[in-house]
């Protein structure tokens, strides 16, 4: 069951590595829990691969004991997807931000 915690403001890879260190899991062990290769996880942590799909983020979050929303990029992706369905809100926000 995922722990309750504050949202991370760090980049995806930094957050994954921090959580791995916190629970004492290696790339190989996390790979076994998620079905992802240790090499791929290493690339994610070091920023050599883009942030994965929401489904992969959800899998990683569960294995690391957090909610998917813990990851900044997951929150941003969710916001973007919802905003795309509301073009009038995009325009209002844009004007309000003075952009």
Which residues does each predicted region cover?
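A short, Lys/Arg-rich alpha-helix, primarily the initiator
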Residues: 1-25
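Residues within the helices of the helix-turn-helix
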Residues: 17, 28, 58
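The alpha-helix within a helix-turn-helix
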Residues: 20, 31, 61
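Key DNA-contact positions within bacterial/archaeal DNA-binding proteins
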Residues: 28, 39, 69
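Recognition helix of helix-turn-helix/homeodomain-like DNA-binding domains
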Residues: 35-51, 74-77
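DNA major-groove recognition helix of helix-turn-helix/homeodomain DNA-binding modules
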Residues: 55-70
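Short, charged recognition helix plus adjacent turn
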Residues: 72-99
């Amino acid at each position: 069951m995922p722990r309750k915690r504050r949202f991370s403001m760090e980049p995806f890879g930094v957050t994954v590595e921090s959580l791995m260190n916190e629970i004492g899991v290696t790339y190989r062990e996390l790979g076994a829990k998620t079905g992802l290769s240790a090499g791929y996880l290493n690339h994610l942590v070091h920023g050599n691969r883009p942030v994965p799909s929401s489904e992969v983020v959800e899998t990683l979050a569960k294995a690391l004991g957090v909610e998917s929303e813990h990851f900044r990029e997951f929150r941003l992706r969710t916001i973007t997807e919802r905003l795309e369905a509301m073009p009038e809100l995009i325009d209002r926000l844009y004007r309000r931000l003075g952009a």
